[in-house]
Amino acid sequence: MWKIKIAWLIILLSVVLLISSIPTAMSQQVRKVTPYVFVGAIPNPVHVGDEVLLHVGITLYTAWPQSGWKNLKVIIERPDGKVDTIYPVNTDTTGGTGVLYRPTIVGTHYVQVYFPEQKVEVAVLGIPAGSIMNEAWSEKLALIVQEEPLEYWPGIPLPSEYWSRPVNSQFREWACITGNWLAPKGYYIDMNCPGNDEAPETPHILWARPLVKGGMGALGGGLAGGGIPWDFEYGDAYEGFFGQPVVIGGVVYFNRYKADGSTRVEQEVVAVDIRTGEELWIRSWNRTRLAFGQVFYWSSFNYHGVFAYLIATRTVAGVTYWDFYEASTGRWVFSYSNVPAGTNIYGPKGEILRYNVNVAGGWLMKWNSTRVVTQRRIQEYGPTDSRRGSWIREYMGTTLDARLGIEWNVTIPRGLTEAVPPAAGPATVYLEDRVMGTNFSRAVLAPKTLHMWALSTAPGKEGKLLFNITWTNPRPDARWHLEAASVKDGVFVLVCLETTEKWGFDINTGRLLWGPTEKQDYKDAWSYSSGYFWDFIYNGKLYSGGCGGTVYVYDVKTGKRLWTYDLVDRYHEWTFGNNWFVYFAFVADGKLYFYNGEHSPNNPLARGSLMVCLDAETGEEIWKLNFFGTCWGGKPVIGDSIIVALNLYDMRLYAIGKGPTATTVQAPESAQSIGTPVLIKGTVMDISPGTRETSVLLRFPNGVPAVADECMADWMQYVYMQFPRPANVKGVWVKLDAINVYTGEYLDIGGTHTDETGMFTVAWTPTKEGLWKILATFPGSKSYWPSYAETAIVVTAPPPSPEIPTPATLAQVTALQTTVETLMIALTALLVIVIIIGAYSIYSILKFKKQT
């Protein structure tokens, strides 16, 4: 009986399950759908020979992981009867995509899109998976191809006036003057700084400020005073101020204090506007310090944009952490743990790459900072999740395991590097597309046989052996170093430290190209022993310099010495030689910048040290400025074509770049008549942010005059460093014009130079009446941006001249004289008669009185 009940129960359950499954089965029934195919063209009309973007696809999108519709075909009927076909075309998940077409003949083209039958892989829009999308055609689109060119965005020229941040994103041309500085320069790092095409051509100072406003001692810097000739501390050696400066988006970031004390003492990061010197914010990052920066471009189907980070590093229990902070605010965003060791190399989109090679173990590894996030997302959500289109949104405020960033790990040949003393270790160089290694380093005497090799890290060639060579040491009992390398120029350079000679090799084959070069100053051997001096390759030239105080420049293809420059100590203050040391800072806009510094300088500092700018091609001196650089602190940096550097002479930061100006002009307010000389006067003043500092305002209550480029170094040292006022200071040129307010008539008044106070004067004699605008224009210089000012003057007609009688002729004079003479005779006779009559009258009166 119980068996029958069980059988009936099974039947009943089966019926229930069957009935309950009917709606689901019905809802999942496959369908056939005829899509709506579209085609558009941008631009339309289009100029013949120009590209047109065809927007093609269907109106129905796909659901992930179906990435889009496949194998669409674009058919273009040309006016000459021929047909062009674009195939295959695959859409994205929106159902559409773009393809490029370049018409070559004028006339109307007809564009049509064919959509082939295919399956719906993932249910979408109520269409079950497995449904069929029928084949379909778009309507034909008439594409007009014309001879007349189209109007395109004209582009924005580089600024001709003072400019500021932020820069409108439409001004793409300005990318060449808005450079960033992300990390210190050093061995095998490109010394050229793109994005600084207006790098300073004079030492004009924009602003000067102490590391900490209102600071004393090392933070205030300079002479300690109190009757002693010593200076406050500099941070050299080993301690260092202005640590690890970074420039991003027109802001310079740096560590406020020395690194000493690590997390046991207060540590702060400061953000300063590079153009104004204004302190934007100060942040304490759990007593960690700024190490380097990142400007990283993320582009995906969800998001496109640049992320700017300031990165602090720390090591806890042997684990290396990177903490990422927003550059705009200093706010912590996320962290990495277990970051592998290595040298940072910035990839094409700003991603940070690190390579590690283990020649004994026979492997080469690449780590990519971006991959940490993308792999974590795949690990957590799977490879098909749509969140992969975003960068960091769901991981803000978290710590990610950086081991996820290992992009590849490949096997390499064993035994590439011969054994060397353990204290020295093999020298390994990481470049943008290869790793190079040697069996020698500058730490010990080199072996008799020099061993050099290179492995590719380029995509598709990971771990490929490029060369593996040996070379008999031509200078035994000496130290050797792989001093410089350039993939672009195809050369790497070895130097023998003891002799300062160099040899050049082909970077792709290891073949010897040239050498030895001429010897350099013997003191350069000390430079090659240090990590603070290095040779570098730029634009086909090898640049070398150091403790000898001479810049040597060689043709990197031949080893021929092209030119030299001596950084002379003209005052004989330097105890290491007749020249100051040469510390290379960077190259920007074809100009080489370098300065003097020292590992552990004496106190007080030697006087007269310099920062120098040369033409990197010719070696011509462009400018030099009184300056003593730091060895252990932050080196000079450049961004937005502005240099920021710490000067140990007063422990202040100096910003060097082109400054704004203000022009004024005055003319008489009362009306002036034609022909009357008029005095026009005005000023051209430097209004850089530094001129508004109290210390400068008190010395220059009427403002700081703008001066000629050739006077700039001495003038800046006077204004900001309180050197004696230079003699024979030259002003700047001012152009003067007059413009009739009503007619627009233009008169060239001429021009003049300002004097050492910034004032100019011109005497002008108007020749035409009317209401005239007087325009004073300072056209700018290598030091200053231009400025102008206007005033007005009324010129009237001259007053009427008094009438002057016409001189009488001789005849008129004679006639007049005759008339006068005749009148004189008559008057004389009349006078006699009057006298006689008068006398007779008196006589008659007297006679009458006697009779009475």
Give the positions of each predicted feature.
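Secretory targeting signatures
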Residues: 1-30, 56, 203, 330, ...
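Proline/serine/threonine-rich low-complexity linkers at boundaries of modular beta-sandwich domains
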Residues: 25-36, 655-662
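Short beta-strand segments of immunoglobulin-like
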Residues: 41-46, 667-672
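Structural beta-strand segments of beta-rich domains
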Residues: 50-54, 676-680
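Short flexible loop/turn segments that cap and initiate beta-strands
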Residues: 59-87, 207, 690-748
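Residue-level recognition of secondary-structure-to-loop junctions
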Residues: 92, 98-105, 109, 115, ...
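Enriched for extracellular/lumenal, surface-exposed ectodomains of secreted and cell-surface proteins
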Residues: 109-133, 768-786
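Repeat-blade elements of multi-bladed beta-propeller folds
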Residues: 160-185, 222-269, 287-322, 343-377, ...
